[in-house]
Amino acid sequence: KQLAGAMQAAGASLRGRGGIRYIYYQGEVKQLVESSHKEVRVERSFTILEDVNCPAVLAEQCFVTSDTDVAQFGSEDGCKRTARAYYEAICAYFETTPLPEE
């Protein structure tokens, strides 16, 4: 939620509930599950999230097919705002204070 909020503050339009969706695959069928869904799922999601021994997030915040996303985040400034949003979200997760921007 921290990352979704930071990306929204940086100018991104959020998709899903508060910018968070879970995706599960059953064979070839893709199923989106909104963040408000509380049922424990047995289906695997993405291997990168399932087979790691540390906290992991797979984030997708911009689409190259979206003129709005490209305009907001395709520049050097947009990349810096995105990097800052990720950095601050990671700091919040580990309960550390981010260093000030230069």
Language-model segments: what does each one mean?
Residues 1-102:
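Active-site-proximal helix/loop segments of hydrolytic enzymes
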